[in-house]
């Protein structure tokens, strides 16, 4: 890296990424896929002093290997971890769940929503998280959605999160009788470069994360959106994945 890049990275490293994102009670549900973003989000929740229940989903995704990384991280941290199994038939029309569809390669940032979008996925995931949060007395849900360096999914936008929070307030006992459950999105406005820098600051074990939509024999393809964005983040920072 040249000197100007080094100076920019120093400035980003000095940025207080890990300031607390929530000041309510100490219980939270964290949606954890096993990828870079959700694992960084998990470590942010730890930095916020939360007592965490991690929640993952097995929905027949072709990148199910991510779940093994989620298990490794939660075991390392000693955090309770639930993996909820959902029928793949609920998620038709996506290349992540239908092997007859091809995962786009080398096509980062096209205008149309890619076929890796999974219909209703975050709606369902957040609904399960709300149920778990209300049942465990948690005041917040962490989700690693991002609307900067991302594939363009509509259920990752801040507008969606805001509307879902309104639904929680209107549709839950907790929301109608007192402070509602918050959805916290600490990565929402960060570039992939900034997410890597945040993870590095939070001491995320990057080697225990996996980001690929179309892995083969346990290895990342290196060409899908998830791989390209991950590579971009680490290349721009000079931070090691190991």
UniProtKB/Swiss-Prot annotation:
Zn(2+) binds at residues 212, 221, 224, 227. One of its GO terms (molecular function) is ligase activity, forming carbon-nitrogen bonds. The keyword Nucleotide-binding applies. Keywords: ATP-binding, Ligase, Metal-binding, Nucleotide-binding, Queuosine biosynthesis, Zinc. It is an enzyme of class 6 (ligase). GO terms for biological process: queuosine biosynthetic process. Its EC number is 6.3.4.20. It comes from the Bacteria. It holds the Pfam family QueC. Binds 1 zinc ion per subunit. InterPro entries: QueC (IPR018317), Rossmann-like_a/b/a_fold (IPR014729). Transmembrane segments: none annotated. Residues 1-22 are annotated as: Disordered. It catalyses: 7-carboxy-7-deazaguanine + NH4(+) + ATP = 7-cyano-7-deazaguanine + ADP + phosphate + H2O + H(+). Pathway: Purine metabolism; 7-cyano-7-deazaguanine biosynthesis. Its cofactor is Zn(2+). NCBIfam families: 7-cyano-7-deazaguanine synthase QueC (TIGR00364). Catalyzes the ATP-dependent conversion of 7-carboxy-7-deazaguanine (CDG) to 7-cyano-7-deazaguanine (preQ(0)). Belongs to the QueC family. This is 7-cyano-7-deazaguanine synthase. It comes from Leptospira interrogans serogroup Icterohaemorrhagiae serovar Lai (strain 56601). The gene is queC.
């Amino acid at each position: 890296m040249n000197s100007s890049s080094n100076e920019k990275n120093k400035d980003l490293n000095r940025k207080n990424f890990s300031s607390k994102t929530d000041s309510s009670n100490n219980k939270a549900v964290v949606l954890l896929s096993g990828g870079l973003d959700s694992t960084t989000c998990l470590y942010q929740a730890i930095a916020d002093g939360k007592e965490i229940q991690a929640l993952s989903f097995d929905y027949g995704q072709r990148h199910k290997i991510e779940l093994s990384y989620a298990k490794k991280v939660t075991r390392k941290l000693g955090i309770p971890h639930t993996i909820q199994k959902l029928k793949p038939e609920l998620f038709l029309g996506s290349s992540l769940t239908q092997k007859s569809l091809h995962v786009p390669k080398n096509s980062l940032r096209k205008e149309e929503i890619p076929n890796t979008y999974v219909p209703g996925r975050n709606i369902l995931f957040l609904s399960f998280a709300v149920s778990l949060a209300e049942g465990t007395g948690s005041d917040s849900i962490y989700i690693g959605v991002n609307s900067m360096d991302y594939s363009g999914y509509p259920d990752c936008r801040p507008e969606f999160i805001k509307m879902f929070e309104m639904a929680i307030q209107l549709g839950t006992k907790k929301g109608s009788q007192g402070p509602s459950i918050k959805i916290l999105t600490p990565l929402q406005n960060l570039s992939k470069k900034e997410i890597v820098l945040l993870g590095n600051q939070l001491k995320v074990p990057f080697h225990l994360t996996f980001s690929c939509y179309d892995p083969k024999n346990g290895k990342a393809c290196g060409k899908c959106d998830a791989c390209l964005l991950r590579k971009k983040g680490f290349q721009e920072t000079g931070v090691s994945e190991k």
